[in-house]
UniProtKB/Swiss-Prot annotation:
The keyword Cell membrane applies. Residues 44-61, 113-206 are extracellular. Belongs to the tetraspanin (TM4SF) family. It comes from Drosophila melanogaster (Fruit fly). The gene is Tsp2A. This is Tetraspanin-2A. Its main location: membrane. Required for assembly of smooth septate junctions (sSJs), together with Ssk and mesh. Important for barrier function of the midgut epithelium. Keywords: Cell junction, Cell membrane, Membrane, Transmembrane, Transmembrane helix.
Amino acid sequence: MGIGYGASDEQLEKQIGCVKYTLFCFNIVAWMISTALFALTVWLRAEPGFNDWLRILEAQSFYIGVYVLIGISIVMMAVSFLGCLSALMENTLALFVFVGTQVFGFIAIVAGSAVLLQFSTINSSLQPLLNVSLRGFVATSEYTYSNYVLTMIQENIGCCGATGPWDYLDLRQPLPSSCRDTVSGNAFFNGCVDELTWFFEGKTGWIVALAMTLGLLNVICAVMSFVLVQAVKKEEEQASNYRR
């Protein structure tokens, strides 16, 4: 009887050790991803040219999702240390707190990513904002500032008007040279709303992918922490029965 119990106890101890150190490694990876997410989101927020374009086009609501992801990446960097400590100490209370933070982190990451995509993809809330701003610039393209903004965007992105060259015709404005391909001389077919949206998608794609990877790690860490809690409780029960 004693031999059987000892073998079972040893097997449980090995299982706890396996889960504990696997959870520790996952937390290290989560910390690295959180750090990378923080760096990318801060870089996106601080990039001068990108920031200027959003300010000029009055589309700074794009940054709402970025702010959410900056905040959650900071929280997740700190929480990863809590996860490492709670796993190594096998403290059930700390592990339950850690599970709660992982659930919160997952929800916040999904929300932040959803908001960021809502303001950076085709058919998103960003496009009506860009359309209003760009049509306003086209309607007043005879003024120096409007002409400067349109030239900057159309030459750099390779687009024309808000939805296409017909915007200038609809608003009775001459088609500027910045709307034409320098090689063929033909007007760019695509409007700047779609081209800018594709440009923003390229900027945010990696960030959202990284954020969702972190969210997946949150789920894995939460499940493993719960498994570790149950294993530690079982070990404590076995130890209590053995003492009796």
